[in-house]
Regions:
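Boundary/junction segments of secreted and surface-exposed precursor proteins
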Residues: 30-35, 72-76, 311-343, 502-534
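Predominantly the structural core of cysteine protease catalytic domains
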Residues: 67-74, 78, 94-102, 114, ...
């Protein structure tokens, strides 16, 4: 007999996993022998499992080297940055993710960079104490929405350097982060445009080769492991228990011939992974590097990941998306038990409104299958808040291809699509090929708040025999159902990337006559005047470049009363060669409550509306009118 609502069963399990996660997340120390060290990996409430497509060799871009070498060390190629020290906080996941990005920059000839782990940990936006830990899914969400990566010099880990607090001085370290020096949203130094997910290790040569191929191709992979209770000897570590992962580290190589006799507890055979830890250079006997046995029962068992920075061709101006928290859940057919939604879901779509004159240049999509054929369609001038994402629209572009790996992929369009100011457009993703039941990725209300509205995100299945496609709105909670009396919504994991074509209506260099000229500034998703969780300082960034490529300056005013100039918050924005810088006056202190006067869905004639500050941090895109002025640096 078919269960009445299998989605409710799955969701309740996820809810129980969330409760378990919250109860255990505060434990962020690993006991190894007589020593205690901070860890910080926490499993997501719902396990997103990637799958290997039929006939696919692996989910990475496999190198053609056959066979794989018996050993590899990315340090030999100059691809690894120095070992860092997370002590005494549970932030290992940010160190693992940033270490991978730093390796990509070295590998591609862009030099050595030191990225900020503190900024990612404090501004991830997920539920729970930031010291409770994280995972690759959380890192992906933070990076793909362009909240990072940020330079260490712009938001240092500790004022006196890493390791300045002892392993038991967590309270003092947290006080510095939360009170003395909270993080604020910053313009990212690098945009992340791709995430490669590597299949979990399961003891087979096939999955072992998947990870080896990823290491050779990308130099480093962020992995999860169990470090509490690990038997250690010298620089060799081995865990053979059944407890869950509690630590995130970076794997940079392997050695098939690493002797089993090197381990305190002898594993069944030779071979080990070479990893870079985040406990400083005095950790172990190899300067903070370790060898973890191939036979470790927990190493590499939670969606290992590679984070790829944008190439110069991918350095887009703005990102649109409602999936602020990334791939939290996978949307499949059995999640909805409401006629006529019985066919496998193979469609998802998002609807956006352009903030100014710009060109749609690329789209981005999450995928859980190692090889997945797709069709992407772009519709312009679609009807807002319609039953389908294509209603009233004109097909502007259609592109087909195959996603070659699990994770997130940015797909450039064959040619940019011009978007006039306030154009409503949709991105429609359709699975093609034989495996149309591949789960669709979405952000849900699990350990985060996506704040989705009707008419923004859709899921559906393709019509057959001439029938129309069937769609449901991801914010239609009557259909999506409820979890223990809590409404949930599903935001499709689809993004749109644009290049700006707006030009100044007057001079665009300080000193020329630009006073009083109006323009629209698109303030990107999570960095857009987002209310800082720790303190009362607002941060924002905008991309406004003049017709001749020179700097365009702008002010934006906000306060309790827009008619009172003494109650205004002035934000000055400068963009030089595509890199924005900010200044604002006055500093917002804890003594006052500020309401942000912004513009939501700006009509042609303007029309200001009140936007409470506590709503800004959960809003996907918001656009503000700014006034150009003759500002000087």
């Amino acid at each position: 007999m078919k269960e009445k609502n299998p989605y409710r069963r799955h969701a309740k399990k996820a809810f129980l996993r969330l409760v378990a996660m919250i109860c255990t997340a505060a434990i962020s120390m690993a006991a190894v022998g007589d020593d205690v060290r901070p860890t910080g990996f926490r499993p997501p409430p719902h396990r997103i499992k990637i799958r290997r497509a039929e006939g696919a060799k692996d989910s990475t871009k496999r190198l053609k080297a056959t066979p794989l070498p018996s050993s590899w060390d990315s340090r030999d190629h100059g691809w690894v940055t120095p070992v860092k020290d997370q002590n005494p906080l549970g932030t290992c996941w940010t160190f693992a993710a940033n270490a991978v990005i730093e390796t990509q920059l070295l590998r591609t000839g862009r030099g050595a960079w030191d990225l900020s782990e503190k900024n990612m940990a404090l501004l991830s936006g997920f539920e729970g104490d930031w010291n409770s830990g994280g995972n690759n899914d959380m890192a992906s969400a933070h990076l793909l929405r362009w909240s990072g990566a940020v330079m260490e010099t712009n938001d240092v880990y500790f004022t006196n350097g890493e390791g300045s607090y002892g392993k038991y001085e967590v309270a003092s370290a947290k006080r510095e982060w939360e009170t003395t020096r909270p993080s604020v949203p910053l313009d990212p130094t690098f945009h992340i445009q791709h995430v490669i997910l590597v299949p979990d290790l399961d003891g087979t040569e096939e999955t072992r080769n998947d990870l080896k191929s990823a290491i050779m191709e990308y130099g480093a992979v962020a992995v999860a492991a169990r470090w509490t209770g690990t038997s250690q000897q010298g620089c060799s570590a081995y865990y053979n228990g059944s407890s869950g992962c509690d630590h995130a580290i970076t794997v940079i190589g392997w050695d098939d011939n690493w002797p089993a006799s090197n381990f305190a507890i002898v594993p069944p055979g030779n071979g080990a992974w070479l990893i870079k830890n985040s406990w400083g250079t005095n950790d172990g006997t190899a300067g903070g590097y370790w060898y973890v046995s191939y036979h470790d029962t927990r190493f590499g068992t939670y969606n290992s990941a590679v984070f790829i920075p944008a190439t110069p061709e991918e350095n887009y101006t703005a990102v649109y998306g409602y999936d602020k928290f990334g791939c939290i859940y996978d949307f499949v057919q059995e999640h909805v038990d409401n006629p006529p939604y019985y066919d496998p879901f193979d469609l998802m779509a998002t609807v956006f409104t352009s903030g100014w004159n710009e060109e749609l240049a690329a789209v981005g999509v999450y995928n859980l299958l190692s090889s997945s054929p797709y069709e992407i369609s772009i519709y312009t001038n679609v009807t807002r808040n319609a039953e389908t994402p294509t209603t009233g629209g004109v097909l502007a572009c259609q592109v087909t291809g195959t996603l070659s790996h699990a994770g997130f992929t940015t797909i450039p369009l064959p040619a940019p699509i011009p978007l006039a100011e306030r154009t409503t457009f949709s991105v429609v993703y359709r699975q093609t090929g034989s495996e149309r039941s591949n789960p669709l990725c979405c952000t849900s209300d699990y350990y985060c708040y996506p704040n989705l509205n009707l008419g923004q995100s859709y899921f559906g299945y393709s019509g057959t025999d001439g029938e129309e496609d069937v769609w449901i709105d991801g914010a239609n909670k009557e259909i999506i159902n409820k979890v223990d009396s809590t409404d949930v919504a599903w935001a499709a994991c689809l993004k749109a990337y644009t290049h700006t074509t707006v030009t100044a209506k007057a001079g665009d260099t300080p000193g020329e006559t630009a006073d009083g000229t109006e323009a629209l500034a698109a303030l990107a998703a999570t960095n857009a005047l987002a209310y800082a969780q720790h303190g009362e300082t607002f941060g924002a960034f905008a991309h406004i470049v003049g017709a001749n490529g020179r700097t365009l300056w702008a002010n934006w005013l906000a306060g309790l009363d827009p008619s009172n100039p003494n109650d205004d918050f002035t934000l000055s924005i400068a963009v030089t060669n595509g890199v924005p810088s900010l200044s604002w006056t006055p500093d917002l202190g804890d003594a006052r409550t500020y309401t942000i006067w912004g513009c939501r869905d700006l009509p042609p004639a303007g029309g200001w509306s009140v936007v409470p500050k506590d709503k800004l941090s959960t809003t996907t895109n918001r656009f503000f009118k700014v006034t150009l002025e003759n500002s000087q640096p």
